[in-house]
Amino acid sequence: MLLPEWISKLEKKIGWLQVPQLGFILICMQVIGFIIVLKKPVVAELLFLDPSAVLKGEIWRLFTFIAIPLTNDFLMLFLWWFLYYIFKFLRVSWGDFKLTLYFILGWLGTIIGSFVFNVPVDSFMLMLSTYFFAIATLNPEYEVLFFFILRIKMKWIALFSAIVLFLQQAFFGAWQMTLCLLFACVNYILFFGPHFYRFLRSEMKRRRENI
């Protein structure tokens, strides 16, 4: 699948800004966050992306929300292994620069959405879901090991993630959080939106010709 041309042009100009082993760095942040929260659970509140707290000088929150563990039990071991496969696939498919750009766009989108709608972000899950969506779009049949033994195709993981996020917002979230979610997905929209737009245009044209 071809990515938008502007991404390749950007890589030629500032490709040196890539972060090698970005996936490993993010997993390490999750490990550190897990250890900290495990020892002092109250610290988790200091890691949230809270717009009002950031404006009061707690700048670290712009980065530390990425380290908030998705769970506080042994399941994190399986999750870290799972994330390793996720980032490895994207790094092989895209290279370090595109993966770095995808991360930065999602990170900035999450921060902007949080500030615009004044919604605290207490999890890495919003950003993580966009990686599921990316792999499911690039190769929906790609399989990863879940719990070290169970092979699951990425299209089902992405679908499950999308359903969970939708249900959370539909039944428990406010409209501000829903819009914040869209901002968090800006990386996916910018990377794959043009492809879907071209596909829809060609499909509409084909159907008109067949009428």
Where are these regions (language model features)?
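A detector for small-residue-rich transmembrane helices and their helix-helix packing motifs
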Residues: 1-211
